[in-house]
Amino acid sequence: EGNWYYVNGKGDLLLGAQTIDNVKVYFDTKGVQYKGHFAPDHHYYDKDTGALVTDRLVKDGSKESYVDKEGKIYNGVKDLGGIQYYFRDGEKVKGDFDYSNSNLYYYDKETGALVTGKYFQHKNNWYFANGNGKILTGKQVIDGKHVYFYNDGYNYGKKGIQAKDKLVILNGKTYYYLPDSGNRAENVTLTVNHVTYYFDNDGVGHILR
């Protein structure tokens, strides 16, 4: 069936972790050599040679992982070829955030690469990652446009979401961010939630009626 085994000088099948000709390999309980998969010892063995893999990105089914210089599963941020990735629970993160510190970062849903210097969409919400990948929060000016991203340190589910079609009160002043672009309303009269405002040149809303 295309399986590989190893019989020692006594005619016994080798089982478990073994070193043969200075190469670390692994055999299951029936003597079948592990290739292209993680073994019960949590190490990955090469799909062609069956040798223990170290310091490399590996794939087992749909799961992508990184193993360190000792062959152990790596967790955390890792730079590979100048591209930053993030591994959580032994797997490359794709289409999700790194919540591990006070700053928020997002990793591309297709490649797993850190998203930098652009707007991106996640679960129908828009965010912006700066040149270092940090998700922006609060009042920002991007491409000359005044925009706002929620900054809720107690609710990571909302942190960094761009305000669109929303009234936002900051330091006692009311601002409105437009539905499509998310740009701040300026020099315009609008009715929002049945209240009519005039938003001045600085975007501050004044109730008219």
Locate the predicted segments by residue:
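Extracellular adhesion/carbohydrate-binding repeat motifs centered on closely spaced tryptophans
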Residues: 1-209
